[in-house]
Amino acid sequence: MDPITFKSLIEIEGKHFILETASLTGGTKYSYFIQLDGRIISQKESDFPDGLNNDGMKQYLQNGHKARAVELESIFRLNKKIDEKATPDTCWKMGVIFLSNGFYEDAKNRFLKAMELDSVHLQASKCYGITLMLLGDLEASIAALNHAKDLGPSFADIYYHLGNAYLFSKDLDQAVQCYLQALQINPRYADARLRLGTACIGYLLQTGTGLNDAKTQELAERARKEAETAASLNPKVRNRSFILAVDYLKSKKYQQAYQSFLDVRPKYVPRTGDEIVFYFNLTLLYGNEGIDLQMTEQYVEKLAKVIEEYPQYADLHHHLGVAFLIKCRFDVTRSLKEFQKALEINPQYKKAIVHSADTDDLNKKVLSVLKKIIISTVNN
């Protein structure tokens, strides 16, 4: 099958973005990237849904390309609106949206603004450190993540990302200590176990360490056990790179095993559902026309798909409950309008009089509950 490619030039606030979506060799995957000033600033690769023929793949790519173009414009439009009344939390959430989409420089600026408004904002400090790591500034990343670690309660993910920054800096001793600390807090942290195993292989690549055969075997076995435990905790770990890494490890090809283990998981995996929830909440606050029924239905659909894959997250179920309540608000309003139309036609229609009054009471109750929930959800 010949490659399918869609390409668009998009101008936003004086910036000229090139968006390209294309199928990859083999016909099972596709990728898209966003380019600015000759530099790729965002790039992702995904699988096609099963069962698509050539025409289906083309239509799927075309629809996705159009949707990404709209999303790109809406993200930057929302970002501009936030500047009008910025708060630490809204800047952090906007930064997470940028970070999840690969706009690292824009994310960094948002996290810096959040910390400027609140110097002890833990989440902004953590995400700032992660962003610096993704930008390749490892020394600054380590400093920022250590600062986040010292700000408040111990979180496993802070130690994990700090461990990654040390690992990419070749400071294996510090990396191992961070991964062990993350696992002490959360023993089921699959990615931390995988990186701990990777660090064990890293020791085998160091020159001049004088490791004997017994120590080499011990480190290789520890790497294998940590990797297998990670795969048992999160089946997504057991991908092609994982299988290659294990094979290389068995055949004592440690350099190839090390690189393959690094490739098993991305340097940064957004927290499940955050981008979807944050975008919806920020649009509630800053959108020009607020939230309409179509956007709410799309939000419900996206969240439901995430929950289907990750049913164990209580906060996502809560957000979906809020979304259904917002959707219910549109239905109640529509009911009220229809009762009022009935009364315009026949002001003495008793059923419409009673039902209109009851629905008006329900509408006020729904509005009151939504006001409390949305303020709480957006500001915390």
Please place each PLM-identified region on the residue numbering.
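Conserved structural position within tetratricopeptide repeats
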Residues: 113-116, 146-150, 180-184, 228-232, ...
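Short coil turns that delineate tetratricopeptide repeat
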Residues: 119, 153, 187, 232-236, ...
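Canonical tetratricopeptide repeat
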Residues: 93, 127, 161, 195, ...
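Helix-start (N-cap) detector for alpha-helical repeat units in TPR-like alpha-solenoids
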Residues: 88, 122-123, 156-157, 190-191, ...
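Alpha-helical segment of the N-proximal tetratricopeptide repeat
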Residues: 80-123, 127-137, 274-305, 309
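Position-specific recognition of the canonical hydrophobic site in helix A of tetratricopeptide repeat
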Residues: 99, 133, 160, 167, ...
